[in-house]
Structure formats: C-alpha cells, structure tokens
Design a protein with these regions (language model features):
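Preference for the N-terminal adenyl/adenosyl cofactor-binding alpha/beta module
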Residues: 1-203
C-alpha cells in the first residue's frame, strides 16, 4: 500500500493497464506493480548518492513529483527510458535522445533493470519509445501520489541508529520494503515470488 488506505493498484479505475492481459489475472498485474515499485524505490536511493564530481547519480528532474507534472505520459517517456535504456545500458551503447540528465546516470549490471517478457517493453528504433504506448498504461496521477508519499521521508544511504529522531528510510528498510512487496504476490513463498518478479535486493 501507499500510505494508509491507498492501494498499489486499482484495476477498476484503470490505473494500470497491461497489453492483452485481462483484469481478472490479478497475479500478472501484481507482479508488474511489484517490479515497478521496487525499481522506483531503488532509484530513489540513487538520488542520494553522489558521483566523483559531487553530482547526484540520478537527477531530481527525472524522478520526483515535479518530474511527473512536467512530463505527460511519465511511465513511457521517462521511467521506461530510465530503467531500460539508461540504467540497463552501458554509457557507450546508449541512444542519443535520452531525457536530459541521463548522461550522468551510471550503468547498473545487477539485472534489476533488465526488461523481461512481462515488462512489455518493445522500443521503437527511431523514437526510442515503447511500441506499447497505447496498450500499456500507468496513470500519471498514480506516480504523483506515490512520489509525494516518498517525498515525506528522508532517504539515506546510511543505516540509521535507533536514536535517529528524523523519520528516515535506509538500505535495511529498503530490504523490508522488497520483502513486503513480494509478500503481496505470494505470502507463503518469498523465494517463488522473487523468481517470478525478477526482484532481488542487495544492500
């Protein structure tokens, strides 16, 4: 859940629509949502890390509630390109027309951002955008609500002590977030859920 009483996915309101997947197939929708949330939260921590020239590894203009306001069709125009064309692609192999700021983002080879079949990612060679623009939909308002919730917390790359007064989210808590998300899919077998979603956490 995102905040008290807020659902990760709402099939009735069409917040998430997947290509050729009936709404009744809740597991496929849940697995997609878990991957999306896991990747987004991981990226939120990247914003806290700095490069050798003291620049954020991931700029605010690509991942924030303000970024959602500035980019209509946020999932396809920004997040897909951030996940699959930037974080999953070595710098020397990236296309030229990536969103501004992508040039400072490192390549991560851990597999978290490698697109799978159920990511429904089919990039157009000319535009770089997915060919599923009209059949895979994640509402901008959902990202607004999600990011506004994340912005209430202090994300830190250092694990906090029990004496910290400020409410912080550290790598240890990130691990718990992943575990809880996986339990949404399969409460009895976290390992099975990890394999199904391709979600692995490394602190």
């Amino acid at each position: 859940k995102i905040g008290k009483g807020k659902k990760v996915t709402d099939y009735g309101l069409g917040i998430l629509q997947l290509p050729s997947v009936p709404k009744e197939n809740r597991q496929i929708y849940q697995e997609f949502a878990v991957r999306l949330i896991g990747r987004a939260v991981f990226c939120w921590f990247l914003k806290m890390k700095k490069s050798d020239v003291d620049a954020p590894l991931l700029p605010e203009n690509l991942l924030s509630s303000k970024a959602v306001k500035q980019h209509t069709g946020y999932y396809h125009n920004i997040l897909e390109r951030l996940f699959f064309q930037t974080l999953n692609t070595p710098i020397e192999q990236r296309v030229e027309n990536l969103p501004e700021g992508a040039e400072q983002i490192p390549f991560l080879n851990g597999g978290l951002f490698e697109p799978g079949i159920q990511d429904y990612y089919k990039p157009n060679k000319e535009t770089g955008l997915s060919e599923n623009l009209n059949t895979l939909k994640v509402g901008d308002q959902w990202f607004m609500s999600f990011f506004e919730e994340l912005e209430k917390y202090n994300f830190t790359i250092d694990e906090n002590s029990v004496t910290d007064i400020e409410v912080s989210v550290d790598p240890e808590m990130l691990g718990r977030i992943f575990e809880n998300l996986l339990a949404e899919i399969d409460p009895d077998s976290g390992e099975t859920a990890r394999k199904a979603t391709g979600s692995f956490y490394t602190p």
